[in-house]
């Protein structure tokens, strides 16, 4: 009941923010006083971005409101986690530099009172979705990981929402992977992390990034877990509707606004199935039949065939139409519980917490 009341209060806060933003922006649209306009700022990291809301550009105004709400929503997520698990898990927001110098936000989770001088095995957890971020779906997994003796970093790679308009831009398989690898290096350098016991865990697009990460830096991770990951981005683009295909092509600079038939090499580069020979880390692959987002026969099924043909060290489990399909890990089902057990058994084998 306490959590429900807290969540209800948070929802009221978001609604209030939306109404406040709407009224404020409406007032600004009528103002001619430049000083009045400049007082309205949207926080983007450490920068105050001033936007002239006297403009007739409705899209700009909507974008400002949308990004502001995403930021408020993300604050609520962190508050909810601390309210529910703060008696045993410490959440710390961090920022680290990616390979190109861009500061990337993230979260570090540790025991509330870490043992002095102890080096903990560590997990990089990688969310999926095309503008998703840390949210309630990860609460149970993070709590379990910390309770079982791991520390966790959760990078909010570029494309994640809740961190401003600039951070919202996606680069599929490029900046997301670079940001996750940078998180792993940052985490490995913390004094309570054992860099020799580092794992990576991802779902959906996060599974794709997990695979790309262990292919790009094969010696960095001691274990990896891919759950319903996108193994072939060329195949993904083949079965998506035209609006989605065009959206992906335009959003990522690496694709240059072109579809696979016009820029095939770029899409093949970000398809993990084409680089399996580089994998060194033991890999656990979990998937389900009946997945509409990452169909088994196009992604996981083919990935397992290639892993086997290349003689890679891996374990796998394919469920038969797990409830929820692509998002079966979000539900409390026998399949989800089995997947969690397999995941921690696998991590325990290679990281020995």
What are these regions (language model features)?
Residues 20-84:
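N-terminal targeting or regulatory segments adjacent to alpha/beta-hydrolase or S9 domains
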Residues 117-128:
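Short beta-strand element of the alpha/beta-hydrolase
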Residues 1-11:
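Bacterial N-terminal signal peptides that target proteins for export
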Residues 95, 157-353:
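Active-site-proximal cap/loop segments of hydrolase catalytic domains
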Residues 73-117:
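N-terminal cap/lid segment of alpha/beta-hydrolase-fold proteins
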Residues 136-155:
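Short amphipathic alpha-helix adjacent to the substrate-entry channel of hydrolases
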Residues 9-20:
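Bacterial N-terminal signal peptides
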Residues 132-134:
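Conserved HGGG/HGGXW glycine-rich cap/lid loop of the alpha/beta-hydrolase fold
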């Amino acid at each position: 009941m306490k959590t429900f009341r807290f969540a209800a209060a948070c929802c009221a806060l978001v609604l209030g923010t939306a109404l406040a933003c709407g009224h404020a922006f409406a007032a600004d649209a009528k103002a001619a006083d430049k000083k009045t306009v400049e007082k309205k700022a949207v926080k983007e990291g450490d920068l105050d971005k001033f936007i002239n809301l006297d403009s007739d550009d409705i899209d700009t105004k909507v974008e400002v409101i949308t990004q502001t709400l995403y930021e408020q929503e993300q604050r609520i997520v962190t508050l909810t986690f601390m309210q529910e698990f703060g008696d045993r898990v410490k959440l710390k927001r961090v920022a680290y530099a990616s390979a190109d110098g861009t500061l990337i936000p993230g979260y570090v989770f540790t025991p509330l009172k870490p043992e002095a001088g102890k080096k903990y095995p560590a997990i990089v957890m990688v969310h999926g979705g095309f503008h998703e971020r840390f949210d309630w779906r990860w609460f149970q997994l993070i709590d379990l990981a910390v309770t079982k003796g791991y520390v966790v970093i959760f990078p909010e790679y570029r494309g994640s929402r809740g961190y401003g308009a600039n951070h919202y831009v996606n680069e599929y398989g490029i900046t997301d992977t670079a940001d996750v690898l940078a998180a792993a290096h940052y985490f490995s350098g913390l004094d309570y992390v054992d860099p020799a016991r580092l794992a990576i865990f991802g779902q959906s697009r996060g599974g794709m990034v997990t695979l790309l990460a262990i292919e790009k830096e094969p010696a960095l991770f001691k274990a990896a877990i891919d759950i319903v990951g996108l193994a072939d981005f060329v195949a993904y683009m083949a079965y998506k509707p035209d609006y989605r295909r065009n959206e992906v092509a335009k959003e990522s600079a690496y694709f240059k606004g072109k579809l696979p038939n016009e820029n095939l090499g770029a899409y093949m580069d970000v398809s993990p199935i084409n680089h399996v020979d580089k994998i060194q880390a033991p890999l656990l692959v979990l998937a389900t039949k009946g997945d509409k987002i990452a169909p088994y026969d196009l992604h996981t099924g083919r990935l397992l065939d290639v892993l086997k043909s290349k003689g890679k060290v891996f374990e796998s489990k394919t469920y038969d139409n797990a409830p929820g399909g692509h998002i079966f890990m979000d539900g409390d089902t026998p399949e989800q519980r089995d997947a969690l057990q397999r995941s921690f058994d696998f991590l325990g084998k290679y990281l020995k917490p």
